[in-house]
Amino acid sequence: MDGKLRADEVAVTKSILKSTFNMWMDVIDVDVVIVGAGPSGLTAAKYLAQKGVKTVVLERHLSFGGGTWGGGMGFPNIVVEKPADEILREAGIKLDEVDGEDELFTADSVEVPAKLGVAAIDAGAKILTGIVVEDLILKEDKIAGVVIQSYAIEKAGLHIDPLTISAKYVIDSTGHDASAVHTLARKNKDLGIEVPGEKSMWAEKGENSLTRNTREIFPGLYVCGMAANAYHAGYRMGAIFGGMYLSGKKCAEMILEKMEK
């Protein structure tokens, strides 16, 4: 390649500002906001966007995937069981059978979030990183969107007013913290919402309770993944992720069913 590269500083800045403005104008009014881009959130985003639902995923960190990247104690593998393996296969993720375990598979802890994130994006979901949801929009006893702030501004402790995104439905997929539900409970004590938090580890119990605990816990607000178990005092599971993928898929299906009515 012999051609000279064009790199005008002002043109770069203008390009970023124009694209960013157009992007924000497109996402300030959506069908679904997903808070947290972990395994359940990305899965929900994929299945919602595939059906043409306008979906935006907000993640406070600069990367998506939640705790998947670290595998188990830093070892670069996670475990997934049947039938959740089909969700990963749909995203083109390679799975290895576990000797002596007919129902279990291992997957690369870097490949999984990378390909699942791409699958959500390719389906039409928008993932925004570095954005924290600091509050919810509550109108007439229904969640109507989220209040957002730059995570960098929050970390710096600066007093700067936030912006908002309007949504028909909000999903809390923030993991163990269940931060969106905690915020709703803390700021609106008259609603009587309590978040007991998750119990200690019991992998089988925790996995099987995830889909059961995935539900609409307040008009317009759903919980999935570990946020669902935190809200319902379910057990934690460790580095087995099948329940979280199934929870995200179920959450998407519940919202799709409601939107069809």
From Swiss-Prot:
Cofactor dependence: Fe(2+)
Positions of glycine binding: R236
EC number: 2.4.2.59
Highest taxon listed in the record's lineage: Archaea
Residues that coordinate or bind Fe cation: D161, H176
UniProt record, GO biological process: thiamine biosynthetic process; thiamine diphosphate biosynthetic process; thiazole biosynthetic process
Molecular functions per Gene Ontology: iron ion binding; pentosyltransferase activity
Annotated keywords: Iron, Metal-binding, NAD, Thiamine biosynthesis, Transferase
Record-linked PANTHER family: THIAMINE THIAZOLE SYNTHASE
Quaternary data: Homooctamer; tetramer of dimers.
The protein, known as: Thiamine thiazole synthase
Organism: Methanococcus maripaludis (strain C5 / ATCC BAA-1333)
Gene: thi4
